């Protein structure tokens, strides 16, 4: 069964405040929509991820794409949630998919176990949603007075993602016309269909009010860890016109020898970022045996590592590079190196440090045979 995740991100979210649609507000360093997408992008169960957006939010979507370093499959939404979902379903149909999971962009804490429950239930049911039993006492009220109690027996709170076989859901939407209903399960019910339930997750709450965002910030903090990555690289020194080091061109009669541009500073930094992401080392991603990387600028290696870090929910917060060599002298180039590394990583310059040292004439660096670089990065990672 080929499944699409359809993310409904066309709403305005005015009750949450903040001046921008809530899916584009910052939460723990990332956009809310970025958090939501990160919960889905790593799951191989999805053959496609479709994001339904408001055409007025093009700049916001571009910012999310830049944050994730991917191109999203977006479709314009409509005036109501029902119309927006219909647009997403039509896109899934055009892609030849069999089923959909429709999810609110403002539910950034979707868990893997819930996705697994929905996929399993789809094998036996054409429509299935997550739900939580109502736990609070209920009563009717009005004019600031408490009325009659309402039994909680059999009452549930619906969540998303809501999962459906695509063909019957499209038929239900065709019968619906322009009527607006609160969710997709209601569309199936209005067409006479049945909807199965699986247990939801209390953490999978929707961001609607300022209080919800305050709760979400606390949850993000509880799910965020600080990680470090370390990298080390060495290249041989030989007479040459140009040396590339920390992304800066240096003309000191020496060059670093290697398969790519041999920028030991950026190579060490790339390995450090890959380490923070748990993504191996530079040789795995850019093997020196591959001719396409011969003479390549090391900028591309670092940007790839940062992309992988973002894709696992990581955010780089600090980078420290130590260059170990008798020559060339690093001092005259330190500021340019710092600025270039800050530009490549997206960090402010105050969170980038370039240090230099020697080995007091000892070893291969002391003899001027080579240059070594060590890098350590700090990153925040949402677990």
From Swiss-Prot:
Pfam families: IspD, YgbB
Sequence segments annotated as region (2-C-methyl-D-erythritol 2,4-cyclodiphosphate synthase): 227-383
UniProt site (Transition state stabilizer): 15, 22, 259, 358
Bridged cysteine pairs (disulfide): none
Binding site for 4-CDP-2-C-methyl-D-erythritol 2-phosphate: 233-235, 259-260, 281-283, 357-360, 364, 367
Biological-process GO terms, alphabetical: isopentenyl diphosphate biosynthetic process, methylerythritol 4-phosphate pathway; terpenoid biosynthetic process
UniProt keyword list: Isoprene biosynthesis, Lyase, Metal-binding, Multifunctional enzyme, Nucleotidyltransferase, Transferase
Pathway as given in its UniProt record: Isoprenoid biosynthesis; isopentenyl diphosphate biosynthesis via DXP pathway; isopentenyl diphosphate from 1-deoxy-D-xylulose 5-phosphate: step 2/6; Isoprenoid biosynthesis; isopentenyl diphosphate biosynthesis via DXP pathway; isopentenyl diphosphate from 1-deoxy-D-xylulose 5-phosphate: step 4/6
Cofactors required: a divalent metal cation
Site annotation Positions MEP for the nucleophilic attack: residues: 152, 206
InterPro entries tied to this protein: IspD, IspD/F, IspD/TarI, ISPD_synthase_CS, MECDP_synthase, MECDP_synthase_CS, MECDP_synthase_sf, Nucleotide-diphossugar_trans
EC assignment: 2.7.7.60, 4.6.1.12
Reactions mediated catalytically: 2-C-methyl-D-erythritol 4-phosphate + CTP + H(+) = 4-CDP-2-C-methyl-D-erythritol + diphosphate; 4-CDP-2-C-methyl-D-erythritol 2-phosphate = 2-C-methyl-D-erythritol 2,4-cyclic diphosphate + CMP
MF (Gene Ontology): 2-C-methyl-D-erythritol 2,4-cyclodiphosphate synthase activity; 2-C-methyl-D-erythritol 4-phosphate cytidylyltransferase activity; metal ion binding
Domain of life: Bacteria
Residue numbers spanned by region 2-C-methyl-D-erythritol 4-phosphate cytidylyltransferase: 1-226
Keyword Nucleotidyltransferase applies: yes
Binding site residues for a divalent metal cation: 233, 235, 267
Family: In the N-terminal section; belongs to the IspD/TarI cytidylyltransferase family. IspD subfamily. In the C-terminal section; belongs to the IspF family.
Function: Bifunctional enzyme that catalyzes the formation of 4-diphosphocytidyl-2-C-methyl-D-erythritol from CTP and 2-C-methyl-D-erythritol 4-phosphate (MEP) (IspD), and catalyzes the conversion of 4-diphosphocytidyl-2-C-methyl-D-erythritol 2-phosphate (CDP-ME2P) to 2-C-methyl-D-erythritol 2,4-cyclodiphosphate (ME-CPP) with a corresponding release of cytidine 5-monophosphate (CMP) (IspF).
PANTHER family: 2-C-METHYL-D-ERYTHRITOL 2,4-CYCLODIPHOSPHATE SYNTHASE, CHLOROPLASTIC
UniProt name for this protein: Bifunctional enzyme IspD/IspF
Gene that encodes it: ispDF
């Amino acid at each position: 069964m080929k499944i699409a995740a359809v993310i409904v991100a066309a709403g305005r979210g005015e009750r949450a405040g903040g001046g921008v649609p809530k899916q584009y507000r910052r939460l723990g360093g990332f956009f809310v929509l970025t958090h939501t997408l990160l919960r889905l992008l790593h799951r191989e169960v999805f053959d496609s991820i479709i994001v339904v957006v408001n055409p007025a939010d093009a700049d916001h979507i571009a910012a999310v794409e830049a944050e994730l370093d991917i191109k999203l499959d977006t479709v314009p939404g409509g005036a109501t949630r029902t119309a927006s979902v219909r647009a997403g379903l039509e896109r899934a149909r055009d892609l030849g998919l069999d089923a959909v999971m429709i999810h609110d962009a403002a539910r950034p804490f979707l868990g893997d176990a819930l996705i697994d429950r929905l996929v399993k239930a789809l094998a036996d049911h054409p429509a299935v949603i997550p739900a939580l039993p109502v736990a609070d006492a209920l009563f009717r009220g009005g004019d600031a007075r408490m009325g009659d109690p309402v039994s909680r027996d059999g009452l549930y709170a619906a969540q998303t993602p809501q999962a459906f076989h695509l063909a019957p859901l499209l038929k239900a939407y065709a019968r619906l016309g322009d009527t607006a209903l609160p969710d997709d399960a209601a569309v199936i019910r209005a067409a006479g269909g049945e909807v199965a339930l699986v247990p939801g997750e209390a953490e999978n709450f929707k961001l609607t009010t300022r209080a919800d965002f305050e709760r979400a910030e606390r949850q993000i903090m509880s799910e965020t860890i600080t990680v470090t990555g370390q990298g080390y690289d060495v290249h041989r020194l030989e007479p040459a016109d140009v040396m590339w080091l920390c992304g800066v061109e240096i003309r000191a009669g020496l060059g670093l020898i290697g398969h790519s541009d041999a920028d030991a500073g950026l190579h060490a930094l790339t390995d450090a970022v890959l380490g923070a992401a748990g993504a191996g080392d530079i040789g795995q991603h850019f093997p020196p045996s591959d001719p396409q990387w011969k003479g390549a600028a090391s900028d591309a290696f670092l940007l790839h590592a940062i992309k992988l870090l973002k894709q696992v929910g990581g955010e780089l917060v600090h980078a420290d590079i130590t260059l170990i060599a008798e020559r060339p002298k690093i001092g005259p180039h330190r500021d340019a190196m710092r600025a270039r590394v800050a530009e490549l990583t997206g960090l402010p310059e105050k969170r980038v440090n370039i240090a230099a040292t020697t080995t007091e004439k000892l070893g291969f660096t002391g003899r001027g045979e080579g240059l070594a670089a060590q890098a350590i990065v700090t990153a925040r990672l949402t677990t």
